[in-house]
UniProtKB/Swiss-Prot annotation:
Gene3D superfamilies with a match to the protein in the record: Urate Oxidase (3.10.270.10)
Source organism of the structure: Methanothrix thermoacetophila (strain DSM 6194 / JCM 14653 / NBRC 101360 / PT)
Entry's family note: Belongs to the GTP cyclohydrolase IV family.
EC category name: hydrolase
InterPro entries the record matches: GTP_cyclohydrolase_FolE2/MptA, GTP_cyclohydrolase_MptA
UniProt name for this protein: GTP cyclohydrolase MptA
Keywords: Hydrolase, Iron, Metal-binding
Gene giving rise to this polypeptide: mptA
Top-level taxon: Archaea
Amino acid sequence: MERLPDVQACHPAYPINLTRVGVTGVKKLVKVERSGERPIVLISNFEVFVDLPSSRKGANLSRNTEAIDEVLEEEISRPVYEIEELCGKIALRLLERHEYATRAEVKMKSEYIVKRQTPATRVNCQEVVDIFAEAMATSGPDPHVKKIVGAEVIGTTACPCAQEIVREQMRRDLLNLGLSEDAIEGFLKKVPVATHNQRGRGSISIEVRDRKCVPIDRIIRIIEESMSSKVYGLLKRPDEALVVSRAHMNPMFVEDCVREMAQRVVATFVELPDDAVVTLKQINEESIHRHNAFAERVAKMGELRAELAAIHEMQPCGASQM
């Protein structure tokens, strides 16, 4: 075969290192095996990058898609159980393919279908969850791989502040109607009190090193349980009543959601090392405000464990002054 010129290997006009060069929007089918269950087939979006030294005009971008295809073909005979593991293998293959690179990065996003039942009528349904994984590999005699896996889940929250304002107004109105204090307190404890709601988007990403793996289903469950209520694609009338009631009996600020995720992550992932980095994020899309509410915590597992271990020394804060 006639040897063609390698323009990418030429010297650039300005010899400057580039942090990331690669391709985005690469769609591939990924099959993930599950122990004792049918495998999951994901339509996944990949982004792959390498760093570029100042001596090269460009990167050989075709090698990026070749690296993805090679790893996916190899995994047909060797099942993949974790998406972050797959990204890690692709990142290492990129370093093999790009001999001039010292760092490779792979990002993968997919829509994952989870099976659920409606809360009251128990009808089987399917819900879509966004999942993602990343891997960063560095070259050397003993290549180092850092992996991230996570998910974003939609739920609903009910505002505690507005609810307390409405509760106080209801208390005054009921007193004016002649009800006793005891009857009013019993009523307000039993009946969901009106407030405004938000569509919440909670996300968790966990960074682990080398061969540690994190089950994605556990992450999804934690996010779902860290808001006022889950939401569903299908709701019959009894389900709708139950979801609304649950949400208003469990009001949460955006900050509450992140703190709830934090304590659930610590309780669930006892096997993770203290240096595993966790990013917890909540965005609540407001219904009566023009802005959205945001909260985030980035910490190592050891830091979260230490904070929760000291919680018994803390006294609950008093009631807010309205």
